[in-house]
Amino acid sequence: MANSLRLYLACIKNTLEAAMCLQNFPCQEVERHNKPEVELKTSPELLLNPVLICRNEAEKCLIETSINSLRISLKVKQADELENILTKKFLRFLSMRAEAFQVLRRKPVQGYDISFLITNYHCEEMQKQKLIDFIIQFMEDIEKEIRDLKESVNTRGRLVATEFLKQFM
C-alpha cells in the first residue's frame, strides 16, 4: 500500500473516531420518529461542520456529522477512462445491494461516488470501532479491486491483440 494511501486512511480513521459520538435525538417535527439530521438538515444547531479530507484532486472523503447521524461520502480515484468505467460499474453493483451493507446509501451525495449513512442505532447495534474498520477496509478493497480489474482487462486486451496479429504472420 502506498504511503500516501496509508496516511489518507489514517486521517479518515482518526476523524471518524472523533466524529462517531452519536446519540439518540428524536425528530423535532414528527413525534416518536427518529430521522437522521444529517440528511434532513432541518435544524442548523444540530449539524456540525463538515470535514473534507483530500488525498489529491480526484480522491476525497467528505464527513458530515450531526447529533444523531454521520454521512461519509467518498470520491474514488479515476485516473483514466478505463478506471472511470470500472469504478462506475463496480460502485453501481455495490449500490444495488445496499441493504446487505446496512450503512451504505443507495444514492451517493452529488459529486461523490459512494456514501455511507451511520445513525446512532448503528452505533448501538454494532461496535463503533468495527464500523470504522469496515469503512477503512472497504476503501482499501475498492482501490485494490479496481486495480485488479484494470490489470485483468489490460491482460485480456493484450492476449486478444496478440491472437489477432498472429493471423497476419
Swiss-Prot record:
InterPro entries: ARPC2/4, ARPC4. This is Actin-related protein 2/3 complex subunit 4. Keywords: Actin-binding, Cell projection, Cytoplasm, Cytoskeleton. The keyword S-adenosyl-L-methionine does not apply. Disruption phenotype: Distorted trichomes and altered epidermal cell types. Its main location: cytoplasm. One of its GO terms (biological process) is actin filament polymerization. Signal peptide: none annotated. Functions as actin-binding component of the Arp2/3 complex which is involved in regulation of actin polymerization and together with an activating nucleation-promoting factor (NPF) mediates the formation of branched actin networks. Seems to contact the mother actin filament. Arp2/3 complex plays a critical role in the control of cell morphogenesis via the modulation of cell polarity development. It comes from the Eukaryota. It is found in: Cytoplasm, Cytoskeleton; Cell projection. It comes from Arabidopsis thaliana. GO terms for cellular component: Arp2/3 protein complex; cell projection; cytoplasm. Expressed at low levels in all tissues with a relatively highest expression in inflorescences. The gene is ARPC4. Belongs to the ARPC4 family. Component of the Arp2/3 complex composed of ARP2, ARP3, ARPC1/p41-ARC, ARPC2/p34-ARC, ARPC3/p21-ARC, ARPC4/p20-ARC and ARPC5/p16-ARC. Interacts with ARPC2A and ARP3. GO terms for molecular function: actin binding.
